[in-house]
Amino acid sequence: AINNLKNIDVHLIARKSKKIHDNRTTAISESNLKFLKDNISNLNTKIFWPSKSIQLYYETKNEKINFLNIKEKNKSLMHVYKNEKFKKILLKELKIKKIKVIHKEIKNLNKIKNYDLVILCLGSDSKIYDKITNFRSINKDYKEIAVTGHVKHKLKKINTSQFFLKEGPLAIL
């Protein structure tokens, strides 16, 4: 990936981030972890929590149904990590690879028209996204909210589970 970009100028244009603590986590497969190990020179694999068990539950009016229960003795099914810790590793890797980070907000396409290749990672609320897609996206308001919480515990073994309750999904990672 980044290792193969010799003799190419790469600019990462990003809005100056606000120092907000991010408790979110992400789960990746064994093959994705291998890709990261192969392509990130300063990857600290201690930030990844291997999981050998995945359980999915669905709640009906009268019962909770465990509709998926996968256990593996010899290999990890997925690896969970804190997004904030992984972001720090990626930013350090950008410095090592001499990728120029430009902190500014792009409000129109004229600012980026001189690049040979532009890859945009934008939310659906972006005005640039609207211009590129020509307002062809479909939006639906489900009139629902999501609540994310962080529970600090001292458990040594985490069994990853997801429950589909009548109130909505609950993931324990």
Predicted segments with their positions:
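Conserved N-terminal helical subregion
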Residues: K34, W49-I132, I138-V147
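Active-site substrate-recognition segment that forms the wall
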Residues: S161-L173
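Glycine-rich, phosphate-binding/catalytic loops in enzymes
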Residues: L5, A27-S29, N134-N139
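A short, flexible beta-alpha/helix-coil linker loop
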Residues: R15-K19, K71-N74, H153-K154
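N-terminal FAD cofactor-binding segment of flavoenzymes
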Residues: H21-E59, V147-H150
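Glycine-rich nucleotide phosphate-binding loop and flanking beta-alpha elements
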Residues: K19, N108, D125-I128, L155, ...
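Glycine-rich FAD pyrophosphate-binding loop
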Residues: I2-R24
